[in-house]
């Protein structure tokens, strides 16, 4: 795994969420990856982008580092829009062939038609929530882990065949 796509999924809100922590985390990842011989390309969801050019980055990448703040228990809406555009537009070419099922072969399962089987991904998130709220049956997330709370994003990558690396999060951000 030498080619890494770093996606900056920050959505700015003036005086509330400027994006400095996201930039700092991306800078740290960039330093580590560069020092270890990785080749890096970047995507910034807030920037104007070409879907075709972004899909070429997805095709090129061996690994995807997806850095974003968690807003209202999920992806910022601009980031969700980016994900929807990339994964849907990549059908039949980059992200998935079909949903995996076959009328001719009942052993083929839903979610097995991904074209990203040679790729790995990592979610790196920032949370206002303290870490003590995860894996705590009395906590806000009612016993769920970080990965369980982010199941929709994980399943999106899984549907496309990508393998999950360990997630990372910074908590108590405000």
Where are these regions (language model features)?
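N-terminal beta1-alpha1 ligand-phosphate binding loop
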Residues: 1-36
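Hydrophobic/aromatic beta-strand patches that form the interior of the parallel beta-sheet core
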Residues: 5-7, 41-43, 65, 122-124, ...
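Active-site loop/turn elements of alpha/beta-hydrolase fold enzymes
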Residues: 9, 45-47, 70
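A short, flexible beta-alpha/helix-coil linker loop
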Residues: 10-14, 128-136, 172-174
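Glycine-rich phosphate/pyrophosphate-binding loop and the adjoining helix
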Residues: 21-24, 140-174
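A structural motif corresponding to the C-terminal end of an alpha-helix
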Residues: 32-39, 113, 119, 156-165
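A short beta-strand-loop structural module common to alpha/beta enzyme folds
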Residues: 36-49, 171
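Helix-loop-strand module that forms the ligand-binding subsite of alpha/beta enzymes
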Residues: 50-153
């Amino acid at each position: 795994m030498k080619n890494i796509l770093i996606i900056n999924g920050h959505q700015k809100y003036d005086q509330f969420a400027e994006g400095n922590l996201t930039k700092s985390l991306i800078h740290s990842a960039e330093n580590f990856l560069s020092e270890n011989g990785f080749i890096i390309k970047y995507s910034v969801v807030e920037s104007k982008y070409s879907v075709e050019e972004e899909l070429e980055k997805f095709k090129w990448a061996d690994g995807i580092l997806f850095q974003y703040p968690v807003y209202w228990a999920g992806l910022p809406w601009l980031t969700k829009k980016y994900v929807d555009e990339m994964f849907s537009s990549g059908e039949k070419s980059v992200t998935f062939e079909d949903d995996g099922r076959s009328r001719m072969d009942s052993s083929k399962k839903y979610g097995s038609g991904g074209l990203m089987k040679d790729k790995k991904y990592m979610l790196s998130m920032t949370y206002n929530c303290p870490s003590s709220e995860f894996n705590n049956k009395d906590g806000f997330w009612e016993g769920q882990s970080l990965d369980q709370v982010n199941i929709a994003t994980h399943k999106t990558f899984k549907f496309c065949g990508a393998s999950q690396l360990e997630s990372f999060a910074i908590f108590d951000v405000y």
